[in-house]
Design a protein with these regions (language model features):
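Generic beta-strand structural signal
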Residues: 5-7, 43, 53, 65, ...
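Extracellular, repeat-based ectodomains that mediate carbohydrate processing or recognition
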Residues: 84, 89, 98-99, 113, ...
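Repeated scaffold domains used in trafficking and secretory/extracellular systems
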Residues: 25-43, 78-90, 133-145, 185-194
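Residue position within the beta-strands of beta-propeller blades
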Residues: 1, 49-52, 94-97, 149-152
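Alpha-helix-centered segments that form part of catalytic cores
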Residues: 44-45, 49-53, 167
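Surface-exposed loop/turn elements that mediate protein-protein interactions on large endomembrane-trafficking
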Residues: 2-27, 56-77, 103-132, 157-187
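C-terminal regulatory/effector modules of DNA-binding transcriptional regulators
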Residues: 95, 141-142, 150, 167-169, ...
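Residue-level signal for tight coil/turn positions that link beta-strands
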Residues: 9, 38, 45-46, 90-91, ...
């Protein structure tokens, strides 16, 4: 259930604008069903945003901050779970699957992880970055100035020796030019850009 904490009264209130709602059924605007599992809630320019998964598709949804309305903004990419992370910048959202193909038993060299840009005004989507290879995921994306930084995480296990192969590469995507480049392959597990 989507709840609001009133700082002044310290009361927790369901985010539902229905006057007679008892907040105990699926008709309540504050109810988030299982299609929203694992999806963090984001607040951007007066609206709430969340990702739901329906019919094998991750969908970006905008919710009025008082809970009075919901609207689908964009179909992001195929997904069977709610492991989609979002970064907002300049009235767009950049979405990626933070689990990807990491540690997948059947991951292949042709598997691809992507970052998809969705324009919040019209829902238009475009793939702005892709990385191909087995056992990879995109992690820790953050916006710094005019660039989106993120990690490519490779995580696999050798079935015969049972040894793990874990490494990270830092990339950046330039919002203005639409180009991405490798910043470091020195196995960086966390970062900050100043």
């Amino acid at each position: 259930m989507l709840m609001y904490l009133d700082d002044s009264t310290h009361k927790i209130i369901p985010v539902c604008a229905k006057a007679e709602c008892k907040h105990n059924s699926s008709d309540c605007n504050a109810v988030l069903d299982s299609s929203y599992d694992n999806s963090p809630l984001h607040y951007y320019k007066g609206s709430l945003y969340v990702v739901k998964v329906e019919g094998g598709m991750a969908k970006l949804e905008r919710i009025a901050k008082d809970g009075s309305s919901r609207e689908d903004v964009a179909d992001l990419f195929a997904s069977d779970d709610g492991t989609v992370s979002l970064v907002f910048h300049d009235d767009c959202v950049y979405a990626y699957d933070r689990i990807g193909h990491m540690g997948a038993v059947e991951s292949k060299d042709t598997d691809k992880v992507v970052i998809v840009k969705a324009e919040l005004a019209n829902g238009k989507t475009s793939e702005v970055f892709s990385y191909e290879g087995a056992n990879n995921a995109i992690n820790e994306a953050r916006s710094f100035g005019d660039k989106l930084f993120f990690l490519i995480n490779h995580n696999s296990i050798d079935k015969e020796t049972l040894t793990a192969d874990v490494n990270y590469k830092l990339y950046c995507y330039d919002y203005a030019t639409g180009s991405a480049e490798l910043v470091s392959d020195k196995n960086i597990s966390d970062y900050y850009v100043d």
